[in-house]
């Protein structure tokens, strides 16, 4: 069968669809990606990674062009980064996300019409579209074909709010108290006012109802970041890439299936993590007990210097903390220094046993430029890191130097590091060169992570620090890793609150700012003592719950089921002999076990009887 997958080419949105496509082609289905031109190279790489001509032939790319409506909004977000970074409860953060995705009335009309026409031409058996891509969603709705949506963001964005005690997605008070109700009222009023005064939003709502003939979902809902898409008459359900139960928004629609982290069935994603050494072994900063077998690097392809650095740390009885703030975040010089000072103190406190793997994003252009409106910011292929940006940092301590002298040198090195900025327009964003940090033995900086799974599963890794993005949060949950969340904007604050509420991590006290003392204190709590042991135990429990949800394989099977149902209904309306023959072939294909010998295949009769429960809201 043919499955169409649509999303903005931003990695946060499309990564879960790539994982789902990985599963679909192994089920024997054809996958067609519909997205912007900038993702062409990534699709070519995805096909090459299959190492199988038959599997690669099942992956197709339908180029939607270079219009603003189809291009990666990562750079647009970066151009608004200073306004986007707000504390929990500040609605302006959500408003900026809305503005970045907004296009003019004519651009919206052209984009939705193009998507509709392309899909009708493809005539897929099922459509899956990213819920955060409004231009693509509208095109799907216009086809009249059955479709599904995928959700890579926080749970509250899909929750139904029936009272003021139900938390607003931007709410900082989420305990269903009187104060939280007042905050929710304030945020709702601000949201309604903002939706009413934006001309482009007004024009879009008019297009949906008058020109496109689509049903309204409500005044605020039609303009929401994630509308209640399950209310559309042709929507057959949604797939939420979050762990079931890991939420504080209790009214989740029954049409949405929570499948956990969007990881594939590749054994690399599911073999037992070696990071399960009891936290008590490092509670007193003692060296870790080595595992009976060395860390396996066989069959991993090209050399990975980050993993080699972690190997050396593990061999020396040292622990590693991994810091990755996602693809949109840009560091300032002060924030980089604050992190370095915090980890210098941790390194000293632990007797040299704690190290930091730091992924440092580099601005690819002027963050203050107007984004897509400038011809200078036309989309380019994803740049691969240069070799000199990945230079290894020696993990060995100089012999004959006392800890005190070394600490003084490290402090001096941090103070003396001076930023190198390309232009005055980029002032404020870190332009550090990686070579400037080679004297700091406790940290390795990297621009590019080759295989994040190998880092997550490494026995030296103890804690993950991230910005609270949906993928980062759920990957840490999947691999059972304690989290320190430096939440920055929009729904990242919700993930930070959830991590603390469910005891799987801690969050920054002064979000969105990076504070040295707060980071140092929180890392101590995560790395040693009874609280660290409790958090690690909770992380393991939620890891099991995430894996049980099924991930990308579950998403693929759900899409397959709906696709088969649609094809059967379509063939039932066409009583020709050809259709009957095709139906029998499809039934045979689906009856073949795919994942395990004991898995029960879905017969057409069973699927037909289940149709009413999954297609009707």
UniProtKB/Swiss-Prot annotation:
Report biased composition (Basic and acidic residues) as residue ranges. Answer: 386-396
| Keyword Transport in annotation | no
Q: In which pathway does it act?
A: Secondary metabolite biosynthesis
Annotated region (Disordered) at 365-396, 567-617
User: Top-level EC class, please?
Assistant: transferase
GO MF? UDP-glycosyltransferase activity
Q: Copy out the induction comment.
A: Expression is induced when cells are grown in cultures containing vegetable oil as the carbon source.
**Record field: compositional bias (Polar residues):** 371-381, 578-603
What the protein does comes down to: Glycosyltransferase; part of the gene cluster that mediates the biosynthesis of mannosylerythritol lipids (MELs), surface-active substances that enhance the availability of water-insoluble substrates.
Protein name, UniProt field: Erythritol-mannosyl-transferase 1
Q: Specify the species.
A: Pseudozyma antarctica (strain T-34) (Yeast)
Source taxonomy lineage?
Eukaryota, Fungi, Dikarya, Basidiomycota, Ustilaginomycotina
Gene this chain is encoded by: EMT1
